[in-house]
Amino acid sequence: YRPYHLRSIGEYSLSKVSLDDRDLPRPMKDGNRVKAYYAYDVVSGAVVGYAYNRYKTTELFLDCMRNMFQTLDRNGMYIPAELEVEHHLVSDFADGLMQAGTVFPLIRWCNPGNSREKRAEHKNREKKYGVEKRTQVGIGRWYAKLEANRPKEEKVYDEKNNTYKVKTYSYEELVADDIRAIETFNAQPHPNQKRYPGMSRWDVLCAHQNPNLAPWDKAVLYRFIGQHTETTIRQNTYCTVMYNQYGLPSPEIIEKLEPRNYKVDAYYLPDADGTINEVYIYQNGRYIATCKPVARYNENTAEQTEYDKAAYTEQSKYVAQFDKMMKDGKIKRVGILAKEEAKLITEVQAEAVPLPAQAEEEDYSAYMDISAFEHDAVAKI
């Protein structure tokens, strides 16, 4: 047997998150299997991110990352210090999202074909032969050494003598069952009860976070994993994303835009319920601003609530700031150039301007020969 490394698990959660993909063991009605991608916290063992797809593509990995950061954001957690991944599905992001220091401080690329190395491989087995085997039908491997780990199969006695009845499920059923299994898995007692008495995997994740973790910059992160759309700044005030308006934080942001160019790229990540709380806008790869939803107010004064009054005040402040910038000349009004002036400008011919000749550098090579100085110094002794 080839020697392998002996390691110990750390002390703090989110110090390292290990990711891996797998096929759910039970087949769909077309005979194929659902592709799943998990993110496990190494210390607590809890699943902090998951995603499903009918196909094993890079979008499966991105969906898992989105789900993980939604979980971290929802629970007020900081960015993991290290990610452990394999080259499969992830290598396309090696120069961006998966480059150490861009989003995550550390990235661990596992060696291909070495399943011992990746912690998520062990967690997949622990989840499959633990909670899944107890709560789902048909979990196991027909060639498993232990009979308890073999699925129960009903044989069909025909001329082939190799036919078995296999129950199939819909895609939605398999995904729902696996999400329930994840919730049960996270709620189970932590395997090391001597170290974490009475605590579940999720309890350890929340209570023992690494104190050196840093908050994450959504403006940078969402550019890699967020949803993207092209939009336009309207009325020097807002942009529209998914049929909703998101306002600029200040009229001064307009100065960051290129002249006469109001087209921007918007990046965002909806919550679990589909709500978009923030939109991060870029122009030609340069960050411009973070936009929040524009609060509309009821124009019927008799029906206005405190919310409507606050929304009216907020919009009025923005307009007042814009008017002040116009008055101060920071934003120029659009003017019309006279035809004569425009014609003169277009007829101007570019002329080459001669550059003054550069003076030759002085020759200091004579000063580099120190033998003459040594001779004079000796003569004076």
Predicted regions and their residues:
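Mobile-element integrase/transposase regions
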Residues: Y1-Y38, A46, E59-C64, T71, ...
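Short, acidic, Ser/Thr-enriched surface-loop or helix-capping motifs
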Residues: D41-V42, Y282
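A short acidic/small-residue loop/turn micro-motif
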Residues: V42, Y52-T57
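Residue-level signal for well-ordered, solvent-exposed loop/turn and beta-edge residues enriched
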Residues: G45-A46, R286
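Short, solvent-exposed cationic patches
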Residues: D63-E86, Y312-Y318
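Globin-like tetrapyrrole-binding proteins
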Residues: M77-E82, H87-P215
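C-terminal, beta-rich DNA-binding module of retroviral/retroelements integrases
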Residues: Y169-K330
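Extended, compositionally biased alpha-helical segments that mediate assembly or anchoring
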Residues: A289-I381
